Every structure is written in C-alpha cells, then in structure tokens.
Amino acid sequence: MLRIPVRKALVGLSKSSKGCVRTTATAASNLIEVFVDGQSVMVEPGTTVLQACEKVGMQIPRFCYHERLSVAGNCRMCLVEIEKAPKVVAACAMPVMKGWNILTNSEKTKKAREGVMEFLLANHPLDCPICDQGGECDLQDQSMMFGSDRSRFLEGKRAVEDKNIGPLVKTIMTRCIQCTRCIRFASEIAGVDDLGTTGRGNDMQVGTYIEKMFMSELSGNIIDICPVGALTSKPYAFTARPWETRKTESIDVMDAVGSNIVVSTRTGEVMRILPRMHEDINEEWISDKTRFAYDGLKRQRLTEPMVRNEKGLLTHTTWEDALSRVAGMLQSFQGNDVAAIAGGLVDAEALIALKDLLNRVDSDTLCTEEVFPTAGAGTDLRSNYLLNTTIAGVEEADVVLLVGTNPRFEAPLFNARIRKSWLHNDLKVALIGSPVDLTYRYDHLGDSPKILQDIASGSHPFSQVLQEAKKPMVILGSSALQRNDGAAILAAVSNIAQKIRTSSGVTGDWKVMNILHRIASQVAALDLGYKPGVEAIQKNPPKMLFLLGADGGCITRQDLPKDCFIVYQGHHGDVGAPIADVILPGAAYTEKSATYVNTEGRAQQTKVAVTPPGLAREDWKIIRALSEIAGMTLPYDTLDQVRNRLEEVSPNLVRYDDVEGANYFQQASELSKLVNQQLLADPLVPPQLTIKDFYMTDSISRASQTMAKCVKAVTEGAHAVEEPSIC
C-alpha cells in the first residue's frame, strides 16, 4: 500500500527516490526509445518528459518540480512541445510514450515559457536589491534565460500580508509564486501539515490559516527549496550576499547523524550553515538546530586561559602560566589519581591525545558522559554499539521496532528516512516507550521494558510480525541505556535481534541490531577504549580531573574531594567551566579540521571555516603542548601524525566516509546471557519528548539566542518573540 496518491508517487520518481519504491525486476528490460531534440535516449516506462530530457543533459526550467517531492505541475514553467502534439505539455508531470520527439527549444516552447514567466512576474514585486534570495534566486535566473526583455503589465500589483510562522523562517508572501514546494515538503518530508493554501486564483495564499509557529524540527529546509524570496532565514536577514561569503564543506556535530553541511563565512564569522548533499546520510536536508544554532558559536566563548586565584575567582592568565600549573599537578599524581571525562562535541584527535597523555601517568580512567553497558559484550564488539543497518538502510526495511527512543528529536534526519520508507514502502513501525509524535503512524506496544522479554519469548503478538519480516530492524535509543537496568535492556534487545536473524527469513547479510546514539563523540570514544559513563570516577574519586568539553553535568564539585584539581578544556563557558581550577580555551567544530564518527560508524571530517576566537587553540594541540611542559612529550607534532596514531589504535577512525560491516551479533547474544536480566518496572521515557526539548541540548545550542527564541515561541506562541521591524 502506498501512503501517497499513486499518480504522484510514480510521476515524481527520480534518480534520488527510485530506490525507495519496490519495483519488479522486469522494468529495466522494458526500456522504450524517445527522442529529445532528435537525440535518441532509452528510458524506463513511467519516466517523465523532464527526466528524459535531463538524461541527455538538457536542463528544463522549473519552479514547482523538486526531485524529492511529489509532482504538482502548477507552475507550468517546464512546458515543452511534443512533435505532432496539438499543445505543449508540462514536462514534470507527463510520462513519455514510445517514439516521442520532445522539442525543448522550438519557437512554440520558447513562447510558452515566455508567457508563463510574464504571468509569474506580473504580481512579483521588484524587491531584488533588498531580497535575501538575490544571487541564488531561481526566478532571477530563469527570467533572464527564458523571459521577455520588457513588461506589458501596467495594472496595480497585488500585495499579500506576511505570515508569522516562528523565529526561524521569514515570510514575504507578496513574492510567493504558489509553487507549493513548502507545502509538499511539510506534509511529505517533515510530516507536519501546518502549511496549506487558502483562496483561489489571484487570491490564493500560502500560510498556516491561523497564525501559529511552523512546528517542525526540519522547518528551515523550506528556505532552501523555495525558488523565490518568499521564504528566507530570519537570523540571516540582511547580513550578507552569497557572493561575499566563503563556503567550507564540513559536517554537523549537533547530533550523532553527522549531516553534511556547508559553512558560509565572511570576515572570520560564520554567517549561515546550509545542507550539503550526501545520499547515505542526510540527502539534502538538515535539522533546524544544525542550521540555526551557529550564533551560539560567538556567545559565551572561552577566549583566554583562566586560573582560580586565592580568593576562589577565575582570572585571565597566559598560556604558559596555565599549562605550567596543570603540568605541575599532573607530575604530582600517578595512576587513577588522574581521570578524564570527554563531552559530546569532542573530536577523535583530542580523544586519542588525552588518552595517550593519561596513559603516560599510568591512568586508564578515561570516561564519557554517556553511559553504555559494559556487561556482556559491552563495547568489546563494535557491532554492539552501532546503527548496523545504516541510515540509508532503513529504506530497505519492512519492519522497525523502536525501543526507548524518540528519533524525531534525537536524530531528525534518521527519522525523516523512516518516514520516507513508511510513506513509500509500506514500512510497519512499532514503539516501546512513551508515546510521541513521530510524524508517521506506529503501533504503540507500551512503555514497560518488560515487553522486550515477552517479545523475546514469543508470547507477545508483535513477535510474529518480527518473525515474518524479511528485513526487520530493532533500534535501541542510547537514552534507554542511561538507566540502571540499561545492561538488561541491551541484553534483551540483543536476544530479540539474534532470534529474528536465526529463526526467520532474514538474509545472512541483513543486520537487525541497531543502536541510535544522540551525541557526536560517543562512537569514536568507544572505538578508542574510553569507559562509558562516570561510574568509575564516582566510585574512586580522583585527585586531578580533566573535563574535555564535558558540559553534560554528569559530575559536580560535590561528587569530588574538596582538594580535587579540575581542568576544563573546551570552547564554551557552560556547565563544566565554572567548577574548574584551570580553563584551557579550545576550538569549536567550525574552527578545526577534526574527525567525528556518526552513529553508523562512518568517520567524517570537519574543516576549518574560521579561526578560533582570541587565544583559543585546537584541543589536540593544547594537550600536546601540555605533555611537553610536563616532560612526557607525545610523539606527534602534526595533524597527519595524530591521525596515524588514530589508525594504530582504531583503523576505522581514518576510513573516511566508509561504513565497515560488522557481524558479531551471535557472539554478542551469547555474552548477553551473562548479564543480570532483571528489568525495572519504570517506563521507558526518552529525554526529548517534545520539540521544546530539541532546541537546546549542548553547549553551542544553549548559547544560541535563536534557539532560545524557538523555545519561547513553542512555549508561548510565535507572537511572543519580538523581531526587528525591518522589511
């Protein structure tokens, strides 16, 4: 069953979306021949005229058509002539027929496009000099290429009242050409039916009908797909032109998905963040936190080293003084008297440098803020803590069981993949945990973790659904593993996954077991041998503690001896810095070339877009300098040498943009039998239940005024956020 209209689903197929609809193997053998301006091309039945033209490299103008959305056919800019046909046809919506000769540059085609463009420009305001879309506007480009050189319109232009849909998207609806891309994105990709049209003909308007915030974690993507300047970025308004900015390809670290992004900078400042195409991860979308939290990069920053004086106050100092103090304390302790905690935004290079430094003083107490059970297989088997099916792999699944997670806010782009498969492939989804709005229908099996034992034993009705599935996925949220019975939950999920693999029709290379992480540094830290959670530090408090970007509040001053010497190294004055005796300012992800590993085990690199503010430096360089002053010099001086060291410890960390398949599920299941199987009666409640919990989850987003406005708008309404009254 298709959950979108059949005609729209078939006509809207493109290279990027064909894989998500199951087709018969005979389709490829039934190719038909058509001609584009006399040039022969072989295409599959159902291919549209527009797709056939693109196959031979002929670009057809369009406004409403988008490769990842259903076909609307309402802008008519893609009109082309078919030889011997009485009228021009809309190329985006018309399937080709055998023997057709498509004329893309005939006089009839040119006249039709010119007429459509004239109608579109009739009511369009001459805002180009003050429009934020200027320089990357489809209407500008296509009016130059396909429009007339003069206007015949003398009547008054219509004006439309702007809509307030929140603090992120700025609307100037007089510029709207009713292409409905934003409406289709909202309903099909984001799964939120907040946008629609009212009125008809000249009175048609796009909006929310009643004034309200556009309640979606993916709302910023409508800015990218809007072909005109009707929808632009509020935080970016009137700040820069696209040709003034320098573009740097990088990745996002706001969650564990690792979305590919482009960082636009000017004069050493991040001006905006845009999505970058990566079919296996984020396609061409990014979350609102990824897109709009960049203003947090210039607020609450640590720009100079600081030390705590005799009065207990933190004061500025030099790098030499700060590092000398830390080195002196480091030389005073040995073994587990020295410990470290790594936060959620730390890169792999800093993790290996800190590990090597503490190993020099015979300490192996290196912990992460996130807990992951070490009982049973624990972190010894890499497949035990990865999203093994991969992010794109969910499009092949036929059943998904979500356990203790809300992927909509923990991993928005992964949730969009699930919705895509649910929409096109008849994917069946079930959830164990608190009921949440996932933007697609699912079976709520309850919120008790004991349901896992019923499914494993076969006594639960959903057990049969899993047994009959050909490609099932069990996805366990990392938030569920923070509980006291996290080990038992992991063991139960591992047991279910292994039983499905061995007793149903699952193919040998299909991976059932999946862990969905929430933070960017966790997989790399586990790969490098960090201990998940701070239990070891709480049981045996150290005399010296390194907090490497640790702002999760997992440990407080009260948990440590009064004389414990705390060093905080990071880029924001958030939770960790105020309790430190020495603060070492580090670089944020836009200010360094660094390695991060996403939840599926894919290593990727951030790139230097701007220089760190003030005296801040890259984390691994700070640790390397500290080691030299302390007389225990680490054996690397360059970034390449650090990455060679990464390769020695864990080769996966330098196999960039590659996912290595792991298949140790049977061993993990056997080892899980050694775990205490006792489950608590407490319900599984993910920490991010609503969109209000999505916006401020790390030191960067908590420093962002834009994210604070989003929380206020969600809580009090879009009208509660005052915006400057300019254009």
From Swiss-Prot:
Core subunit of the mitochondrial membrane respiratory chain NADH dehydrogenase (Complex I) which catalyzes electron transfer from NADH through the respiratory chain, using ubiquinone as an electron acceptor. Essential for catalysing the entry and efficient transfer of electrons within complex I. Plays a key role in the assembly and stability of complex I and participates in the association of complex I with ubiquinol-cytochrome reductase complex (Complex III) to form supercomplexes. The keyword Transmembrane does not apply. Its main location: mitochondrion. GO terms for cellular component: mitochondrial inner membrane; mitochondrial intermembrane space; mitochondrion; respiratory chain complex I. It is a peripheral membrane protein. Residues 245-301 form the 4Fe-4S Mo/W bis-MGD-type domain. The modification N6-acetyllysine is found at residues 84, 499, 709. SUPFAM superfamilies: 2Fe-2S ferredoxin-like, 4Fe-4S ferredoxins, Formate dehydrogenase/DMSO reductase, domains 1-3. Core subunit of respiratory chain NADH dehydrogenase (Complex I) which is composed of 45 different subunits. This is the largest subunit of complex I and it is a component of the iron-sulfur (IP) fragment of the enzyme. Complex I associates with ubiquinol-cytochrome reductase complex (Complex III) to form supercomplexes. Interacts with MDM2 and AKAP1. Keywords: 2Fe-2S, 4Fe-4S, Acetylation, Electron transport, Iron, Iron-sulfur, Membrane, Metal-binding, Mitochondrion, Mitochondrion inner membrane, NAD, Oxidoreductase, Respiratory chain, Transit peptide, Translocase, Transport, Ubiquinone. Binds 1 [2Fe-2S] cluster per subunit. Binds 2 [4Fe-4S] clusters per subunit. [2Fe-2S] cluster binds at residues 64, 75, 78, 92. Its EC number is 7.1.1.2. Residues 108-147 form the 4Fe-4S His(Cys)3-ligated-type domain. Belongs to the complex I 75 kDa subunit family. GO terms for molecular function: 2 iron, 2 sulfur cluster binding; 4 iron, 4 sulfur cluster binding; metal ion binding; NADH dehydrogenase (ubiquinone) activity. NCBIfam families: NuoG. This is NADH-ubiquinone oxidoreductase 75 kDa subunit, mitochondrial. Residues 30-108 form the 2Fe-2S ferredoxin-type domain. [4Fe-4S] cluster 1 binds at residues 124, 128, 131, 137. It is found in: Mitochondrion inner membrane. It comes from Bos taurus. [4Fe-4S] cluster 2 binds at residues 176, 179, 182, 226.
